[in-house]
Structures are given as C-alpha cells and as structure tokens.
Amino acid sequence: SLPALESNTRQLLERQELLPPETYPGPHAVVQFPLSDGDTYQMLLSQPARQGADGIWCVERWLQGNGNLYYVYPETEVSAREYYADLQAQCDEGHQPWLLEPLEVAAEYIRQDLAQNSVGLEQLTLLENASLDDFYNLPNN
C-alpha cells in the first residue's frame, strides 16, 4: 500500500541520515497506552507550529508493541506546515484549547484514529521532554 511504502521510505532515509530522525524539531513527549489486544503501544508527540507552553501538540508517529512503526500526517489538501499553522492560530484565538495538552491530543488520536474508545486518560502514561531513544525503547509486552 502507498502508506506502507511511504513509511518504509521514511524509515530508510532516517536510518541513512538523509532525513532528520524526527518530523518536527523541538520538545517531544512520549505517551504509552494499552490497546484491546493487551499490548502497550507508544506514540511520539511533537509541537509542529510553535514550541513551548502555548504551542499545540500533534501525534508524529506511533509504535506497536511488536515494533511496527507508523508515521502520522494530517489528511488535508494543504501542506502539514499550513495545516498546523492554521490549528495554532485557531488555538491562539481560544478554539480547541485541548491541543495544548499532549495527553488530550493522544487520547483524541486513540479514540478517533485508532478507534479505541475504551482507553481513558487514566490509562495513558506521559513522559515529558522525551527523546527519540525514549520513544523507541519499547515496553515489555
């Protein structure tokens, strides 16, 4: 499939150091979460438009317990840069303030994109100021 091909290409280019190891530079957060299969998964969250307390968060990539990696890009007609700049502007105007909270962003992604409605905020574990090593260090499943 095209998404799998794109993901494999990105992984290859990152390993060869032809692309930076993260999509968005700056601070990251790692969120661990259980899914219905019993495994613990994790996601890497980034601040794509502005870094700091007033910057929105997005899910950059997530990792299954078996090591399968999935990159996340907004499904939109505009570039990711434009998309996140618009979301940041909306948030600056007081709309969608939950985008400022990495746990809320993670929970929304789990519900909407992974269709796991039974996972609540209390089941999520947040590691702030995380590194890529933190993200790739899989929990024991």
Which residue ranges define each predicted feature?
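Short beta-strand edge/turn micro-motifs at domain boundaries
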Residues: D37-T76, N141
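Short beta-strand segments that buttress and anchor functional surface loops
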Residues: A29-S36, Y136-N140
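Mature extracytoplasmic domains of secretory-pathway proteins
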Residues: S1-P27, Y83-F135
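Low-complexity, intrinsically disordered terminal/linker segments enriched in charged
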Residues: E60-G94, Y109
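Intrinsically disordered, low-complexity segments enriched in polar/charged residues with Gly/Pro
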Residues: L5, V30-V31, T76
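Hydrophobic residues embedded in beta-strands of well-ordered beta-sheets
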Residues: P27-A29, G52-W57, D134
